Design a protein with these regions (language model features):
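Cap/insert and terminal regions of metallo-dependent hydrolase folds
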Residues: 61, 66, 91-100, 170-231
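Metallo-beta-lactamase
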Residues: 2-9, 94-159
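Active-site metal-binding loops of divalent metal-dependent hydrolases
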Residues: 34-36, 72, 134-135, 165-167, ...
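Metal-dependent catalytic neighborhoods of phosphoester/phosphodiester hydrolases
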Residues: 78-88, 229-231
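Short hydrophobic/aromatic-enriched beta-strand-loop microsegments
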Residues: 32-33, 92-93, 109-117, 184-189
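Active-site-proximal beta-strand elements of phosphoester/diester hydrolases
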Residues: 12-15, 30-33, 128-134, 160-166
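C-terminal structured domain segments across diverse proteins
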Residues: 132, 155, 159-162, 167-170, ...
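Pre-active-site segment of Zn-dependent metallo-hydrolases
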Residues: 1-10, 16, 20-72, 79-84, ...
Length: 231
């Protein structure tokens, strides 16, 4: 699909692999957790993308109104991708502490909206991006939990979309579902088949329950299909 050729007034969601999503909603174009590199780690030989899964590059993206980053792990925040997108991004939306990466990588401070859980970035016509709780952790290289992790709700008068980011199952899903009155679509963490990780990622049965808790009309599982992260 030629993403640049899509009518921006047509609401759509395109999963680009792993946790990367291209979203058009309410006349806005959003890109969530883009990783277009062939690896998701500090070194090129680790956590390599499966062959044939890098179908898009930063050059294939249209201008992006909002770049959403859920947390600063390598498979969600990629330096090469972020810098390649810089000239196309209107505003970055991220949880607390993550904005420092973008400022260090040449983004203007005025282009970064950084918020705590339950912060809201409001636009015209009833459009809003809500930064919401997740059960996870953060860190790059030797740092750990110096920045926040989050999910997002994308809201217009016509539609509500939820993105979990990385998250284990928890009561926050039911609380979010009640707060927003349900969602048209939930894009949820799924498929890291390691019981030792179940408090920071969801097994498939957890994902299904989270979708019910969120009162989602449709479920799009993610965090699969590109990297072998769990063993």
């Amino acid at each position: 699909t030629d993403l640049r050729g899509l009518d921006r007034n047509t609401d759509t969601v395109v999963w680009l692999g792993h946790s990367t999503y291209f979203v058009q909603l309410g006349g806005r174009r959003l890109l969530i957790d883009p990783v277009f590199s062939t690896y998701a780690s500090p070194v090129f030989f680790a956590n390599r993308a499966f062959e044939g899964t890098n179908l898009y590059t930063a050059e294939d993206m249209p201008d992006i109104d909002y770049l959403l980053i859920s947390h600063d792990h390598w498979d969600h925040l990629d330096y090469a991708t972020a810098t390649a997108l810089r000239s196309k991004v209107g505003q970055v939306v991220c949880p607390l502490g993550v904005g420092a990466h973008f400022e260090a990588w040449g983004y203007g401070k005025e282009t970064v909206f950084e918020g705590d859980w339950y912060s809201v970035l409001e636009g015209k016509g009833g459009f809003a991006i809500h930064i919401l709780p997740a059960r996870h952790f953060s860190g790059r290289s030797l740092t750990r939990n110096k920045t926040l992790w989050a999910g997002f709700a994308l809201v217009t008068p016509e539609h509500r979309i939820f993105f979990s980011g990385d998250s284990g199952y928890g009561k926050h899903f039911a609380e979010i579902g009640a707060r927003f009155g349900g969602f048209d679509l939930a894009m949820l963490d799924c498929g890291q088949y390691d019981e030792n990780w179940r408090y920071v990622h969801m097994m498939p049965e957890d994902t299904a329950q989270a979708a019910e808790d969120l009162r989602a009309r449709a479920l799009l599982p993610g965090h699969v299909g590109k990297f072998a992260i769990a063993y």
